[in-house]
Amino acid sequence: MKTKEIVDDMTMKRAITRITYEIIERNKNLDNIVLAGIKTRGVFIAKRIQERLKQLEGIDVPLGELDTKPFRDDMKVEDDTTNMTANVNDRDVILVDDVLYTGRTIRAAIDNIVSLGRPARVSLAVLVDRGHRELPIRADYVGKNIPTSRSEEIIVHMAEIDGQDAVLLVEGA
């Protein structure tokens, strides 16, 4: 299998900063936002967006962690490790994930969010959109569009868990 780094740490930082600016531009009331990071790497991306929002706008946006496994249609897991202390009722919830592929993880995340309350709006921010949707889901905020074939895989490395920031393309996975 051939592996190629397609996003380095500086490019990832810029992509997350761009997503943050787009969130600021498209949301009139930043006080109504709740970030919901999808475990595992989506949580780290959401924390970085949260930090940038604080730096740029001086606002402390609530952040929760979503576990999508209990809501997936392709696996049966009982343990739900969701940690969402913020009230999502009538709030603008922004789901945050590392890679958007088939859309099945996002569908599970939406199911999880609506099990917690009734948000005013749910939008989606992803670091990488690689295409190949199986469900009618699209990201509102995208760091990088990286078209792939189905035989390729996108792997996101985050410094918090992997020791470095990078996005890798693995051919023939």
Swiss-Prot record:
UniProt entry keywords in alphabetical sequence: Glycosyltransferase, RNA-binding, Transcription, Transcription regulation, Transcription termination, Transferase
The keyword Glycosyltransferase belongs to this UniProt entry's keyword annotation: yes
MF annotations from Gene Ontology: RNA binding; uracil phosphoribosyltransferase activity
InterPro entries hit by this protein: PRibTrfase_dom, PRTase-like, PyrR, PyrR_bifunctional
GO BP term (any one): DNA-templated transcription termination
Catalysed reaction equations from the record: UMP + diphosphate = 5-phospho-alpha-D-ribose 1-diphosphate + uracil
Enzyme class: transferase
HAMAP family (alphabetical): PyrR (MF_01219)
Database matches in PANTHER family: BIFUNCTIONAL PROTEIN PYRR
Role of this protein: Regulates transcriptional attenuation of the pyrimidine nucleotide (pyr) operon by binding in a uridine-dependent manner to specific sites on pyr mRNA. This disrupts an antiterminator hairpin in the RNA and favors formation of a downstream transcription terminator, leading to a reduced expression of downstream genes.
Stored NCBIfam families: PRK05205.1-4 (NF003548), PRK05205.1-5 (NF003549)
Subunit structure: Homodimer and homohexamer; in equilibrium.
Name recorded for this polypeptide: Bifunctional protein PyrR
Species, as recorded: Streptococcus suis (strain 05ZYH33)
Source organism phylogeny: Bacteria, Bacillati, Bacillota, Bacilli, Lactobacillales
